[in-house]
Amino acid sequence: MAAAHIERHIPESTITLIESPTIPIIGVGESSLPQLRNFFNELGIDDDTWVSECNGLIKNGNEKVSWNGGDDRFKFTFWYDANGLDDWLDDYQKYNLPKESLNDKFYSDKGWQGYAYHLDAELIPTLLKKYTERTTHIIDTIEELPKGYDLYLDCTGFKRKFVRDRNFIDLTSRGHIVNKAWVQSFKLNEKPYNYTESVALDYGWQFNIDTREKRGCGYVFASQFCTTDQALKYFQEYNSDYEPYQGSEPRLLEWTSGFLDNPWQGNIVALGLTSGFIEPLESNALYMIQYSITNLVKTIKRNYNPQSYNKVMKKLWLHNSDFLLHLYKLSPRNDTDFWRYYQKDNTDLTLWQNYIKHNNKWISLYPSSMWANVAVLYDEFSKKSQYTTV
């Protein structure tokens, strides 16, 4: 992604990409946000091309299951008509409408970017190679940086082999306690689902991401409340109706939620998982990669300093963190120690502060429409008048 974008926007650049033949791709299937469309469109890749070549599907949103307790289901969509919210809210409160009626007035396919994608993570690099004609591609595993380059992009993941400043902002104390995931691909037993499904479970949640041939699943959990073996047992039981795709086996992913305070230090820039990771919820990881690349190119072209890049990235990481935490903290679930952990904070006020702040004033990862989705999911509109006057 970085090589293709830099080629496109800094045509005078000379790029060498060194790819290890022994380090596999982490993804089990990727769910994206609508902003990814702009990234690929700028490269000249239309929907039909990359959806077909990446085994992809159009994604219309995210369905939350059991976050509100029981079998409650609610679909977050990307369509947004700002003028429809107040009208819908009046009817919702007067006539006790179902939450799903929000789609009738609040969303518009002419609004906030419309749709996103599901795609096979293993196929994305193959497609992007076609759009990096000037990039020298070397297959090798290196232990030190080659000399003679002006700028190095460290994409070595959690190992962070080459970054100069390892000052890490740990978000665990902020409330990001999910730190492991069992992931596996399964054969589809049914028609592919055009929403990412996020199912709240006892000690975390499971994502289900359908592409045209398979379903990528992962049980994201907090190890302080559930052992790795227990989580594997839960994961296998929950997905017992599905057959592994091409003999796939469960894989364990582990991380510490957080980000580098200074991802650009000297002439080395941390990208992707090297820069940071919070968790898979809300398909945020791929967007953070995308934004770090586009922000880097803008910083270079405007001749800004690395400190300005680092400041913007830190702001986005914290904004990302705020939104994800509200999904946990506003949940009324208290059936396990995991969910009771989040009951100690009252986030009603901060929900509405964020809604107002992002209401068509910021171009951000989660605009006001997404905060409104959270409010509808947890029936926070019944409390709106208490908090929106502050």
Could you say what each language-model-derived stretch is?
Residues 71-144:
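Conserved N-terminal helical subregion
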Residues 24, 28-104:
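Dinucleotide-binding Rossmann-like beta1-alpha1 core, especially the glycine-rich loop
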Residues 298-390:
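Long, low-complexity C-terminal extensions of enzymes
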Residues 5-28:
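Glycine-rich FAD pyrophosphate-binding loop
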Residues 5, 113-239, 293:
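Predominantly flavin-linked oxidoreductase catalytic cores and closely associated redox partners
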Residues 2-13, 39-42, 134:
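A short, Lys/Arg-enriched amphipathic alpha-helix followed by its capping loop at the start of a domain
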Residues 16-20, 107-113, 213-215:
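A short, surface-exposed helix-loop junction/capping segment
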Residues 212, 221-326:
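FAD/FMN-dependent oxidoreductases across multiple families
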